[in-house]
Curated annotation (Swiss-Prot):
It is found in: Endoplasmic reticulum lumen. One of its GO terms (molecular function) is adenyl-nucleotide exchange factor activity. Keywords: Endoplasmic reticulum, Glycoprotein, Protein transport, Signal, Translocation, Transport, Ubl conjugation. The gene is Sil1. One of its GO terms (cellular component) is endoplasmic reticulum lumen. Residues 1-260 are annotated as: Interaction with HSPA5 and localization to the endoplasmic reticulum. N-glycosylated. Ubiquitinated by the CRL2(FEM1A) and CRL2(FEM1C) complexes, which recognize the -Lys-Xaa-Xaa-Arg C-degron at the C-terminus, leading to its degradation. The keyword Signal applies. This is Nucleotide exchange factor SIL1.
Amino acid sequence: MAPQHLPSTRMASPGMLLGLLLTSCLTLCLSCQNSNNFALTNPEKSIHQESDTKETREEEELDTEILEVFHPTQEWQTLQPGQAVPAGSHVRMNLQTGVNEVKLQQEDKFQNNLKGFKRGRRLDINANTYTSQDLKSALAKFKEGTEMENSKDELARQATVKQLFRPIEELKKEFDELNVVLETDMQIMVRLINKFNSSSSSLEEKVAALFDLEYYVHQMDNAQDLLSFGGLQVVINGLNSTEPLVKEYAAFVLGAAFSSNPKVQVEAIEGGALQKLLVILATNQPLPAKKKVLFALCSLLRHFPYAQQQFLKLGGLQVLRSLVQEKSAKVLAVRVVTLLYDLVTEKMFAEEEAELTQDSSPEKLQQYRQVQLLPGLQEQGWCEITAQLLALPEHDAREKVLQTLGALLTTCRDRYRQDLQLSRTLGRLQAEYQALASLELQEGEDDGYFRELLASINSLMKELR
């Protein structure tokens, strides 16, 4: 039985206790119902998400950040934090204040660098750099499209080349429409020979044809082609023309065709060219015609011992002697002396070469030995003729005569010693070239032209003592 003496305030009624219990249960149920809405996620995941969000915000802030470009001058100025310094500026830290200071190094460099900077835009540190993504993309395209690009470039190059050149058939067709014919050298020479050999051609046309023909026969193959279709004989027959101009230019063509062309030289001898050339030199002809004929004769005789034999048999030395003695043909004297010098030395070199090589079948040497040139020169009085030519006033002519005198020395030694005029001429020339050689030495020329001539004269005088 409950005590009766307890106060009423300390007594809990059963109804109140029941109400408190119901309130607690209701609160617990509501908490359990909303637990899913307010439950915590994985702590690590939340930390990473928070970090990524922070970095993203920082990048966005960095991307949207606008850097202020500092404009330095010639004086030191304080650099504020966040300011961009143009390239070429001088930056230092003030040890007293602890702040960075900037000034302009060179005004020109500063002005050039500021060209790329604009206010209100982000500073571009290096506009020529590439990102890693750019490089990866370019490399992928390069690997995929190299072969395709190469083939396209090659096709483009071929197309460009084709545009520069046109097919020969197309050109021929257009030339045919223009009445222009593409000719080979052979066809041109045939046309020129026909023009020269035509009775309907005028003198001017014949001379023009020969003049053009001389240009082509300088080539060895063309000269032999001229021989193959009979054009060479037509030109040789032109030496019989009554027109001096035709003789002159026919000899001009022959001289070019004979030069260093043995096959043409042989055919010319068989075609009677040598006889015709000597006849022109022996008769009264204009000097220009004789010059061209002498040129053709020299081309025919050089390096052709059989032609030299025939030249001696046909009285060639007598013809040349008469030519040199003509007063109107003195200009040809040096050319004649040069020809004789070439023929004498050519034979000497052939004999020396045969001895050095010890050729078992010296056919060429045998041909040269049959050329009795030196005895013929002595018999025809060429020892005296060459000595007289030493009196020519030209230095070049004297040089060639001195060379010829030296080549003929073994044959003409006695004649030279008995020639008083030659002795006086050599003495006079010795004094003249001593003075000229002294002038050369004063000008610093140790091996001058006149010194060489003086040496030749001294050597010849020594041999004749």
